[in-house]
Amino acid sequence: MKFGKIVLLTNILLVPTASLAGGSHDHDHGNKAGSGLIETEFGKYDPQMHPTVTIEIRMSDDMKFTPATIQVKQGDIVEFIHANEGQLMHEFVLGTLQSLNDHADEMKQNPSMSHDKPFMVHVAPGETGTNTWQFTESGVFHFGCLIPGHYEAGMRGTVIVGS
């Protein structure tokens, strides 16, 4: 009977510990260990790739990204480092203009929706987040903070991918 009590006590002690392991969700939805290969019309993510370019982007409560225009070459693997210098939560979502507009509309309906793709990063106030993305096609692509009200206030930018 002692063995049964020890197992029960161990399970009671481990359950709260396990729940604390995921405790404070920092909303960094960048390079997820479980993310596999993802390909889109604006590029791809592969967990095996290594950055060839690093770009720092500052996010602010005046609803701006700095820089708001980024130039890269087709094939570049970019590590984005996002610094939220404001007091509000901000996010960085890459996409086409249409995909960003669609996602912004979805966010109005469900502002707490999950962001689990490697082209999306939530960054808490005063924090830094990262994500890595390869631009496989030349063209003009977009990014924005799709938290309701931010995108509409002008928190958006452009990625120009040259060949």
Q: What does each of the following model-derived ranges do?
A:
Residues 108-116:
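Short beta-strand and strand-turn-strand segments in soluble, beta-rich domains
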Residues 57, 68-94, 129-137:
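Beta-strand cores of secreted/periplasmic/IMS beta-sandwich domains, seen most often
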Residues 16-18:
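N-terminal signal peptide c-region/cleavage motif recognized by signal peptidases
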Residues 22-35, 64, 117-163:
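Extracellular/periplasmic metallocenter environments
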Residues 1-8:
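Bacterial N-terminal signal peptides that target proteins for export
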Residues 98-109:
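Short aromatic-acidic-glycine turn motif
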Residues 42, 46-77:
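N-terminal edge beta-strand
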Residues 26-50:
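N-terminal pre-domain segments of enzymes
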